[in-house]
Every structure is written in structure tokens, then in C-alpha cells.
Design a protein with these regions (language model features):
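Bacterial Sec-exported substrate-binding components of ABC uptake systems
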Residues: 4-5, 10, 19-53, 152-181, ...
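Short helix-initiation/N-cap motifs at beta->coil->alpha
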Residues: 33-35, 84-95, 215-224
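A short, structured surface patch at a secondary-structure boundary
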Residues: 45-100, 104-110, 208-211
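Structured C-terminal subdomain patch of bacterial secreted/periplasmic proteins
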Residues: 46, 92, 137-140, 144-147, ...
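His/Asp/Glu-enriched short active-site or ligand-binding loop at hydrolase and phosphoryl-transfer sites
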Residues: 71, 196-219, 267-268
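Flexible loop/hinge segments that line or gate small-molecule binding clefts
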Residues: 73-79, 111-144
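Short helices/loops that flank or line small-molecule/ion binding pockets
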Residues: 94-102, 222-231
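Extracytoplasmic ligand-binding site segments that recognize negatively charged/polar headgroups
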Residues: 115, 130-144, 177-198
């Protein structure tokens, strides 16, 4: 082999090695919150997001433009309403999702069946599961999605912002000893938050006690009698019923002797920030603090 041929071979080998190293360096490997390892050749640029909280995380780290489809309950921020809707949960239409040509579908562990996941993966779509119940798991979801999108630094900045707000609120609480009840759904199927939920943590951050904080489950079904017996000083509605929900609970039969009802200390989560385990939990903590300590919005304890 001539010297020219050897030199050409070495140059080509170096180019190939550099290209291979570049490709290897851009590969994304994540372990989702269901313990499944997912590998992408590069950060995702086309994604269908099935649940509201994950959409809010994507937008918070600057990836809204990568969202090509959304579940029917995904509605924040308002600009996301222009993105095509796909059915979620048991009604998920795989063909509808595939038509949007996503690289990744981001979903909740309870939302889609194994068969639907299998169909998506057989068609080359990566499925990443995000599932949250407490604040630490929200941080995990933010880091997961940040890595998936090649936005690790942005994800850490969002987490730091949340932590800073929580710490500032904790420093301002006055050792309040009163109790709060979170109503997630109204009668006849009353659901509330237990000790392993982020709502319980929001109460702790604000220096108050969740009346069902002695229950280990994150979410649990309860009876009206239990609420009446535990006599909360504050009630927070996460029922998505607007002002009608407040009016209903204030006039609910048998609840008239509850402190929160007598003093009309009922707060409605009308912007859904308490309902969603997303970066807006920061806003939820501010709203709860302002409600409990009767502070006007412009006097927020954190930016």
C-alpha cells in the first residue's frame, strides 16, 4: 500500500472516529419513573405530552415548541391550546398519536394500557413514564424531562427556584397550629390528600396541619363524618368547580359547625396550580400562604 493510500486511510479513520464519538456523546439515556430505560440518539425535538403537569414542566424548561400533541386535559399555558389534541387514558388512539410523528410520548403510569404502549414502541416511538405524588418526585420528574430534552441546567434552575420559594415561605410562617382540609372531589365520592402527597407538604411549608396527614396514602377516599369530626379551620377545594364549589360546600348539609364553614375560610384552586404536580407548586404554596395568613397578592412572600 502506498504512503498516499495509508495517509488517506488514517484520515478517514480519524473522521469516522470523531463522528462516532460525537454521536455517542449526544445519545440520551434516561430511566423513567416506572424503572424503564429509554435511549434516544439525541435530545427529543418532537413530543406528545399526555398529562398537564408534564406539559407545564416542558414549558418551564423552555421546550414548548417541541410539543406536537397534547392530552385533552392539557390546557396550561394558554398558548398550548393551539397544539393538536389527542385522546388520553383508556380512549387513547395510537394512530392519532402516530400521525403527529413524535419521537417520544410522555405519559402517566395510570393513563395508558400496556397494549397501547407496545403499539407505540413497535412503531418506533419512545414511551417515557412520569408519575408523581410528593414534591421530591416532582423534582425527579423535572430532572427526567430535562435530561430527555437536553435541558439539564434549565431543569435544575426550575427546581432551585421552587426550593427557594418554599424556604422563603417557611421562614415567614408564624407557627400556626390550625388545620386544613383538601377536597379533591365532592360527595358522594370524597377524596383528599394524605401524608405522602405534595398537598400535605404544601400545608407543612405554610405552617399548618393537614387533617388527614395521619394517613399514609397520598390520595384516599373518606367520609363526610370524618371531615366533620376533624373540624378543619381551612378548606381548600381542588374540585375544578369554580365558585359553584365554594357555594356548595358553604351550604353543605351537616357541615355548618365546621370552623372553616362558620368563618367562611374556603379557598378555591381556580387556576389548578394545586391540582398539578408541576413547577407551579411554587405558586400554589404562595396562594396557600396568602390565604392562611390573609395577605394580599401583591405582598407575596416570594417572587
Amino acid at each position: 500500500m502506498s504512503k498516499k493510500m495509508v495517509s488517506l486511510f488514517l484520515v478517514l479513520l480519524m473522521v469516522f472516529s470523531a463522528t462516532a464519538s460525537l454521536a455517542e456523546g449526544s445519545e440520551i439515556v434516561v430511566t423513567d419513573m416506572f424503572g424503564r430505560e429509554v435511549t434516544l440518539s439525541e435530545p427529543a425535538t418532537r413530543i406528545v405530552v399526555m398529562q398537564p403537569s408534564d406539559c407545564e414542566i416542558l414549558c418551564a424548561i423552555g421546550c414548548e415548541e417541541a410539543i406536537v400533541g397534547r392530552g385533552q386535559y392539557v390546557d396550561y399555558p394558554a398558548s398550548i391550546l393551539e397544539v393538536p389534541v389527542v385522546q388520553s387514558g383508556a380512549e387513547t388512539n395510537v394512530e392519532e398519536i402516530l400521525a403527529l410523528q413524535p419521537q417520544v410520548v410522555l405519559m402517566n403510569s395510570m393513563s395508558q394500557s400496556e397494549e397501547q404502549v407496545k403499539q407505540l414502541e413497535e412503531n418506533g416511538v419512545k414511551v417515557v413514564v412520569s408519575t408523581t405524588s410528593n414534591i421530591e418526585s416532582v423534582y425527579t420528574a423535572i430532572r427526567l424531562i430535562g435530561k430527555l430534552m437536553g435541558k439539564d441546567a434549565e431543569a435544575e434552575a426550575v427546581i432551585t427556584d421552587m426550593q427557594t420559594t418554599f424556604d422563603e415561605i417557611k421562614a415567614k410562617t408564624s407557627g400556626e397550629t390550625k388545620k386544613v382540609y383538601f377536597e379533591i372531589s365532592p360527595p358522594p365520592y370524597l377524596y383528599t390528600a394524605g401524608s405522602s402527597s405534595y398537598m400535605n407538604e404544601l400545608a407543612e411549608i405554610c405552617g399548618i396541619t393537614n387533617i388527614f396527614g395521619d394517613q399514609e396514602d397520598a390520595w384516599l377516599m373518606i367520609s363526610e363524618e370524618q371531615v366533620i369530626e376533624r373540624n378543619p379551620d381551612y378548606i381548600v377545594l381542588i374540585t375544578n368547580m369554580g365558585s359553584a364549589g365554594v357555594e356548595e360546600i358553604l351550604s353543605r348539609e351537616g357541615w355548618g359547625d365546621i370552623n372553616a364553614i362558620k368563618n367562611q375560610k374556603v379557598f378555591n384552586d381556580d387556576d389548578s396550580c394545586m391540582a398539578r404536580p408541576s413547577p407551579r407548586l411554587k405558586d400554589a404554596a404562595i396562594e396557600l400562604y396568602n390565604f392562611v395568613y390573609e395577605i394580599e397578592a401583591e405582598e407575596e412572600p416570594a417572587a
